[in-house]
């Protein structure tokens, strides 16, 4: 409704809801679709490119996320806190979340301590509750994926500085942070 209220002609903006394998495949292969713009996983991006290739469609992809915060010793004193809080938005489920923090060695220990303090201060609760907190992840599959990533980090040599196991009964996970690995 808002699109039409601001004056866009019908057909200029179309929003199609559905799953990637069904609706996404149909749209990316359809001969009347000239351009596909997608933000999401690298796996899905590869599939879109394959589907769009036969029709020589224009494709714009924003894939994978995993942006990094690079923090040097002369950075703003609040850079670590802002970086941690940015990754926690939307319960950490934003494709543009800065999920890595690359810190100059001279301030590494201080940054780890600050990150742990900030993470420890973030409440975790149900989204129906009022207040400043993060809520559950979207579903069991995402919860299991996150738990697997945490375990992979530990298996590869990272040490958890905050957090631990999640709360599978309500798909909540503790806010984890690991040191370099």
Q: Model-predicted segments: where are they?
A:
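A short, hydrophobic C-terminal helix/tail in secreted or cell-surface proteins
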Residues: 176-181
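PLP-dependent aminotransferase-like
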Residues: 1-24
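ALDH superfamily catalytic-core signature
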Residues: 29-30, 35, 41-175
């Amino acid at each position: 409704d808002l699109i039409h209220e601001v004056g866009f002609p019908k057909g200029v903006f179309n929003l199609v809801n559905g799953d990637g394998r069904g609706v996404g495949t149909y749209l990316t292969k359809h001969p009347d679709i000239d351009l596909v713009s997608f933000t999401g996983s690298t796996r899905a991006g590869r599939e879109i490119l394959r589907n769009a290739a036969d029709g020589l469609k224009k494709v714009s992809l924003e894939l994978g996320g995993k942006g990094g915060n690079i923090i040097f010793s002369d950075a703003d004193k609040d850079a670590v806190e802002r970086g941690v809080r940015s990754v926690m938005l939307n319960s950490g489920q934003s494709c543009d979340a800065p999920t890595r923090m690359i810190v100059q060695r001279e301030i590494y220990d201080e940054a780890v301590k600050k990150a742990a303090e900030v993470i420890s201060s973030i409440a975790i609760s149900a989204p129906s509750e009022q207040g400043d907190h993060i809520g559950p992840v979207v579903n069991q599959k995402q919860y299991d994926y996150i738990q697997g990533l945490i375990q992979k980090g530990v298996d590869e040599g990272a040490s958890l500085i905050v957090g631990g196991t999640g709360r599978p009964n309500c798909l909540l996970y503790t806010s984890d942070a690991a040191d370099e690995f």
